[in-house]
């Protein structure tokens, strides 16, 4: 699952991951993740800076909830300086934009295979 308010990012990552064989779901509104009840993704790519919501707050919430705490979360941001705060929020990993697809795939494979 990809959550990013930039449609270009959603499309680009979605196309690349589908090409690699992943089933991809996405949302431009990170707040919708707060109401996940039935279908949980194998991994969540979550932008930190989205309109009206901070991805770190979503991450904290999901990591506190019993039903979602085991979902690996990779927080993504254009600011490399906030990696520490991303990890403090409970993220399993961090990726700085712009990134290489190989770096993204390595993080996805590491977390999906270990979960």
Protein language model features and the residues they cover:
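Active-site residues of response regulator receiver
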Residues: 4, 47
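Acidic, metal-coordinating helix/loop segments flanking the phosphotransfer/catalytic sites
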Residues: 26-43
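The feature encodes the CheY-like receiver
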Residues: 10, 51-52, 97
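Short, glycine/charged-rich "phosphate-handling" switch motifs in NTP-dependent
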Residues: 92
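Two-component/phosphorelay signaling modules centered on CheY-like receiver
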Residues: 7-25, 111
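C-terminal output helix
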Residues: 99-112
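Hydrophobic/aromatic residues positioned on beta-strands within the core alpha/beta folds
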Residues: 74-76
